[in-house]
Amino acid sequence: MRLFLALLALGFAAVAAVPAYPQRIVGGSTTTIQQYPTIVALLFSRNGNTFFQACGGIILNNRNVLTAAHCPHGDAVNRWRVRSGSTYANSGGAVHNLNRVRIHPNFNRRTLDNDIAIMRTTSNIAFNNAAQPARIAGANYNLGDNQVVWAAGWGAIRSGGPSSEQLRHVQVWTVNQATCRSRYASIGRSVTDNMLCSGWLDVGGRDQCQGDSGGPLYHNGVVVGVCSWGEECALARFPGVNARVSRFANWIRNNS
């Protein structure tokens, strides 16, 4: 899920991945996995038996999935599974167990800097029209301000509201880094160069939300962000914050 700042302030960054408050798409509409075959649902179990969708992920290749570090951080690898190839959060497609989770070595559980991880599945993800490897932004990917980007996920449809069983998507825009940094500094939060802000600035109503954490932010079909955190969801003053994929291009390549 995308983490609420209230949880961070209480020091719960590590446990939120399951979350008490997972994130979902706000202000968007339903879509299908055929439109976003690079996204997967990450399933979590508290007891090792019953699994439910708690985060999103992005297919890198037939054995590796990119996600937010705060989702699996601190959990045993067998508490997470990957559902690929399904429009629905908790049914359909193929479910894969994991044999490894690699958290970025500089991940900061308090600030959520370097909020990125790679999960390795025990079985191959079969590619078809509902499951495909993503195009990932390279180190020199040029992404300007006010660019149209799209987010997708199964998260909440409003802050604190119910999650969506069907995949949803929403159009938002990239937000100037200095503006985003200033907005969050006013409430004591740090936006680093490893982060990418998006939303509908000064309007609100569109965003990623609880349960969308780890899911993709696309620019012209290229994954440029991984859903990370924000002040509630879809507020006019505070954009959503993603891990900026271009900053991690080499690490992703070397670990997948």
Curated annotation (Swiss-Prot):
Propeptide-annotated positions? 18-24
Q: Which InterPro entries match?
A: Peptidase_S1, Peptidase_S1_PA, Peptidase_S1_PA_chymotrypsin, Peptidase_S1A, Trypsin_dom, TRYPSIN_HIS, TRYPSIN_SER
Q: In which tissues is it expressed?
A: Midgut.
Q: Which keywords are on file for this protein? A: Disulfide bond, Hydrolase, Protease, Secreted, Serine protease, Signal, Zymogen
Q: Where is the Peptidase S1 domain?
A: 25-256
> What broad class describes the main subcellular location of this protein?
secreted
Identify which residues the record assigns to the active site. H70, D115, S213
Q: Which GO cellular component terms, listed alphabetically, does the Swiss-Prot or TrEMBL entry include?
A: extracellular region
Q: Which compartments is it annotated to reside in?
A: Secreted, Extracellular space
Q: Site annotated as Required for specificity: where?
A: D207
Q: Which residues form the signal peptide?
A: 1-17
Q: Which GO terms describe its biological process?
A: proteolysis
Pfam family membership, one:
Trypsin
Reactions that this protein is recorded to catalyse: Preferential cleavage: Arg-|-Xaa, Lys-|-Xaa
Q: Which GO terms describe its molecular function?
A: serine-type endopeptidase activity
- Enzyme superclass (EC): hydrolase
E.C. number: 3.4.21.4
Organism superkingdom: Eukaryota
Q: Which PROSITE patterns match?
A: TRYPSIN_DOM (PS50240), TRYPSIN_HIS (PS00134), TRYPSIN_SER (PS00135)
SMART domains found in the cross-reference section: Tryp_SPc
Record-annotated disulphide pairs: C55-C71, C180-C197, C209-C233
Family (UniProt): Belongs to the peptidase S1 family.
In terms of PANTHER family, this protein maps to: AT26814P-RELATED, POLYSERASE-RELATED
| Official protein name in the record | Trypsin, alkaline A
> Which source organism?
Manduca sexta
